Each structure stands twice: as structure tokens, then as C-alpha cells.
Amino acid sequence: MVEVLSRERETILERIAYFEKQKLEAFRTAFSAISENFSRIFATLTSGTGRLVLECDDDPFAGGLTFEVQPRDKAVHLLSALSGGEKSLTTLAFIFSMQQFLPAPFYAFDEVDMSLDGSNVERIASMIRTIAAESQFIIVSLRKPMIESADRIVGVTVRPDKSTLVTGVRAGD
């Protein structure tokens, strides 16, 4: 009986080790691809440099992930030290990096362009337009460049009587 339990224990420990190894390999594959995507996309959006850094490279599940970014003509910063617009661009670069690795069927963004200046809104709108060939985007925005890049526009207005008017138009109409 003890021998049987001992063998079963060894089998279970071997399976656990196998799955832990598989988990680590899958993570490293995903992290490597997403990290490369992030560096490229961040450079496209900001003309700067950015990279993803694991807090504990030996055991990535024991720590977190940090963004080390250098927007054009600025010093290297962590995410917490960036302006609102720089944080938005960094976060969107990360989302787009994951999207390129494993696309989702649709994305819902609520005023992601709020903290951005006009030229950055145009860059984000252009990137979303390109990615929209693979995934659908539902975006709430008040910014003209984002609205102008849409295939369909839904306007929502509150009337004086507090009721809501919803109108749909095709872009370019």
C-alpha cells in the first residue's frame, strides 16, 4: 500500500512539474512576442523607445511587469512618472501589442483619446483603423480625428426634456 501511494505521489509530482514547465514556456513565448510588439508600437506612436521589464526574470510569476519608456526627447520613466497623455499612449501600445499576439474579436474603448493632443489622436485613430481589419472597435470619443476615422458613427444627444436622441450616420455622409 505504501509503495502504491509513493508511486502515485511521484506521478503526481512529475505531472505538476511538467505543467509548470509548460506554463513557463507559454508565458515566455507570449512575453517575448508582446515585448517585441510593444517596443515597435511604442516607437511608432511616440517616436521614442519603450520596453517591458519583468520584476523577477527568473520566476516571472513571482513578480510583476513594469513599463520602461522614453517618449521622444525625454528621459526614461516608469509609467507612474508620465503625463496623462503619455500614460494613455503607453497603455494603448501595450493593448495593441497584446492584440497583435492574440487578437480579440472586438474592443470597447471609452474616451481613450481624452488626454491626447490632436496629433496623437490622429496616430491612435490611424493605428485603430489598421487593426480594425482584424477586429471590431467600439469607441466612445468626442475628438474629431477619431470620429472622422470611423466607419460608422452613432451620435447620442440629451434633449431639453432629459430624453436621449440616438442618431446613426455613415462616415463621410
Task: Go through each PLM region and give its residues.
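Terminal ABC-like ATPase head and other globular end-domains that cap long coiled-coil arms
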Residues: M1-D173
